[in-house]
Amino acid sequence: MAVIDLDRQLQELRKEFARTAPAGRVALYESRIEELRSTFARHAALKEGDRAPAFSLPDAQGGTVSLSAALKQGPVVVTFYRGGWCPYCNLQLRSYQALLPELASFGASMLAISPQLPDASLSTAEREALTFNVLSDLGNDVARQFGLVYPLPQELRDALSSSNKALPSINGDASWELPVPATYVITPNQRISLAFIEVDYRQRLAPQRLLAALQEQAVT
């Protein structure tokens, strides 16, 4: 099966936004990405070799999914995304959906985590035809344990609100906090073998790199 060129799709989406969005909004988003690059405490985020925290979270169907149960079946890919309102997140989720047969060949499974309410997670799963677990991390509790959470500045709060993307209504809390997009590969002994953390939400872990990490793990 051909692997989706996620990097190319993300770049095309970025160019389309720059072409069609108001110049002031494009400049605002660019400046806030650079600001986050300098202020985000990357050293505090979990990295390769760290032990992943145990967690249990509600899924989009009303059940509960635990990392420990998933690890009993093999390696787990855990990806933190901002929410179904983010088009870059949706591109990533669709590309990872297409990877599921390859993941299964390594005995691996996928968990996607965002701070949005379960109803919003269900909408995301249905709209994007996702068959892996889409989990709701209310209050960013698990993302915080991974060291990924940051608050949005007022300008971004205003911009999202004006675009009908007010986070308090989507996430069910007034914190205006999000996780930095990140993808981890976690081994059955709960160790992190790959950590991809990127403050620029327009960049995500390429499917090819994810498969390479699983391949490397399979032969070690």
What do these predicted ranges mean?
Residues L67-Y96:
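Short active-site neighborhood of thiol/selenol oxidoreductases, capturing the structured segment around
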Residues I4, F40, S123, L135, ...:
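Non-catalytic interaction/Regulatory regions outside core domains
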Residues M1-R51:
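N-terminal targeting signals for export/organelle localization
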Residues D137-Q203:
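Thiol/selenol-based redox catalytic cores and closely related redox-interacting motifs
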Residues Q92-Q145:
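Structural microenvironment flanking redox-active thiols in thiol-disulfide oxidoreductases
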Residues R51, P75, L178-V180:
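Short, small/polar residue-rich loop motifs at catalytic or cofactor-binding pockets
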Residues V199-Q217:
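A short, polar/charged loop-to-alpha-helix boundary motif
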Residues P58-A60, I186:
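A generic structural motif
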